[in-house]
Amino acid sequence: LADADDGFKYVLKFRGAGQREKALIAELLGGEIARTLGLKVPELVFAQLDSAFGRSEGDEEIQDLLKGSQGLNLALHFLSGSINYDPVAMSTDPYLASQIVWLDMFITNVDRTFRNTNMLIWNRDLWLIDHGASFLFQHAWVNWKKNAEGPFPIIKNHVLLPIASELEAVN
């Protein structure tokens, strides 16, 4: 979480982390496809990370992450006061659930499960976050076309699948 020059707080997605630029591209594409479909996604912005950012950080691993992320990164507008979506405690409209499952099948998002829903409740609305693990085919370029066009069996683990009864209507 970082304060930006525009006075807002953002959740930074570091270029130097994990899958590096691929995850940021997936985050941007997945989030904007969701937004285009009418789903709620926090504002995505490009964030310039100055070389002085985190210089006083004592943890060497975090220092390495920050050094590897100097320059252009991606950030999501922080939804202050939001809470994690809990499928046990909260009800979701079946049509909305179907839209989200359809989106995650389309972008092959493996990361919206019961353990980690990657959804927030903010101002009584459901918001989607964290699309960095989307576009699964990008992680295995051998047979990429077959992988991109083939079935997506991991969708069986989707947190909203049990209530997504309107998939035909959404499709």
Where on the chain are the PLM-derived regions?
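Conserved ATP-binding subdomain of kinase catalytic cores across diverse folds
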Residues: L1-V88, A97-V110, T117, W122-W127, ...
